[in-house]
Amino acid sequence: MRKSWKILLAGCLCISFTGGMTVYGDMERSLYPVASVTVQEEYSHIAVSQVTDYVNIREQANTSSRIVGKIYNNCAAVIEETVKGEGGDWYRIHSGTVTGYIKAEYFITGESAEKLAQSIGREFATVNTDNLRLREQPSLSSNVLTVLSQGARYVVLGEEGMFYKVEVDADLVGYVAQEYCQTQVEFDQAVSLEEERQRLAEENQRKQEAANAIAALEQAKQEEAVNSGIAASEMLIAANPEQSDNSHQASAPAMISGFGPASPGGMPGPGSAAVMSATRTAIVAYAKQFLGNPYVYGGTSLTNGADCSGFTQGVFANFGITTGRSSRDQAENGREISIDAVQPGDLLFYASGNYINHVALYIGGGQVIHASNSTTGITISPYNYRTPCKAVSFLD
């Protein structure tokens, strides 16, 4: 798994691309200690990996020494020195938290690295003011598409005049004034063995939390059935996404044990407060195990790629709840609630003008999980990373 290497416009690497990355005078100087370093000076020490999958980083310049990390294709590294090692030249590199040796043949450097870095680096803008207007065109007199929140960050697609062109979601692109943003470029970087273990542990933890939450939901439904004398037919809920990924394609009426049959809008009938709470917890935990999976326009696969409504549709389908396919269908089919009253497991909707074009799942703590765009994939954002226009519930 790759890690991102962040460059705050100017900083430890101080890279200034010809695309217009700018260091502003009102930024904190402590973040930019070497702002005068040129692109040419820095790229003489930068390498970009060119490998089929990944190569190991070694403690010494030979293949029998201890592995200290791994680096994937198109990752950036700083070359600290070139040494003679087993089979020829090796670089001593630093990338992320990893320092070690790797054969020079696996990297490109100099002008070739500079050109490639400009294509593989991902630039982001972080809003540093409240209620920043996203405009349709790079002009202060242009129509406002939505309002962005302080601290949220967005993919930068380009620069026009004193505006950044940003991709908020795959379905929303607009312009923001540069003076209200701080930008940075991120590259993939090497990972240590400990970081690799930690990543796998976090993935397994999310899967286990989903399995535990679903088991708790089933237990709550069984207890309710016993207490109420209901002999409900249990619908199996799969916590394993590989087994359940296509479940949202089923068209049969849903039955959730402890609830009545799903209504035409997909909402289950009355259930106990305990079952409702467990359902919300399970939906959120189930959704979070797909964090980092790809965004694919028109996609409905929770593992291989989904768009915003394909993601929410698939999550709810795993619990026998039919939402509809598009964000507009889901906004219409759910029971509308106040945005201020949203709870974990409810849906928030976003629009361009009067046209709903994005949906996200509220997970609590002022955050949503959603399939945003091809750069970020399925990600967690502040609920007001753009202004929500509607909220609905499919749960009560």
Which residue stretches match the model-derived regions?
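Aromatic- and glycine-rich peptidoglycan recognition patches
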Residues: R2, I7-G11, I15, G20-R29, ...
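SH3-family beta-barrel domains
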Residues: R2-N56, G69-N73, I108-R133, V147-Q150, ...
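Short alpha-helix capping/helix-loop boundary micro-motifs
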Residues: A61-R66, P138-N143, Q330-I337
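SH3/SH3-like beta-barrel superfamily modules
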Residues: I67-A104, T146-E179, M255
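Solvent-exposed, polar/charged alpha-helical surfaces in well-ordered, non-transmembrane soluble domains
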Residues: G69-N73, T146-Q150, T281-Q289, S309-A317, ...
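Extracytoplasmic/periplasmic cell wall- or extracellular glycan-interacting regions that localize
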Residues: L116-A117, E223-N293, Y297-G310, G314
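Catalytic cysteine-centered active-site loop
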Residues: L291-P344
